[in-house]
Amino acid sequence: MSCRSEHIWIEPITGSRKTSNFCWAVILFLGSLGFLLVGTSSYLGRNLISLFPSQQILFFPQGIVMSFYGIAGLFISSYLWCTLSLNVGGGYDRFDRKEGMVCIFRWGFPGKNRRIFLRFLIKDIQSVRIEAKEGIYARRVLYMDIRGQGAIPLTRTDENVTPREIEQKAAELAYFLRVPIEVF
């Protein structure tokens, strides 16, 4: 859902707040909580979960391993929830022909580089480039070649876009910026 006028084009970037990431965070949290409860119930010798009688699972070695998996899963789940709440990777791309500027903004992890803000002059943009790799792990990435800076990716490498969509986006952006398109 981009916002576009005659002189300004703003392209929002989703970042880590995707449905699949929410699903993985919930599944991982519930699964690791289950493992931790089973390990704890085997240690206490009580049924904290009514699905498994605590006598069937010995604390050593099954209960210890399940507790370890539960704790590790909770750490990974908390990491996922932090990236979701901080919207790591989210932001926007703003192309302003009136001012002759391109601004790329992304949210990062807390610390020195929490806000990643890049600015370029439109006249320094050499081309819009499409990099396509076919095969089992096919990927298509849209880059912007900046003179003296190299290529800056505009789409995520894990986005599953069709060749038609990436070509259309590249053509619209190249037309808006008045630069050529390169395909690799």
Swiss-Prot record:
GO cellular component labels: chloroplast thylakoid membrane; photosystem I
Subcellular compartments: Plastid, Chloroplast thylakoid membrane
InterPro entries per the UniProt record, alphabetical: PSI_Ycf4_assembly
A single BP term in Gene Ontology: photosynthesis
Transmembrane segments: 22-42, 57-77
Key words of the record: Chloroplast, Membrane, Photosynthesis, Plastid, Thylakoid, Transmembrane, Transmembrane helix
Topology with respect to the bilayer: Multi-pass membrane protein
UniProt main location, coarse: plastid
UniProt record similarity statement: Belongs to the Ycf4 family.
Function, in words: Seems to be required for the assembly of the photosystem I complex.
Protein name stated in the entry: Photosystem I assembly protein Ycf4
Record gene name: ycf4
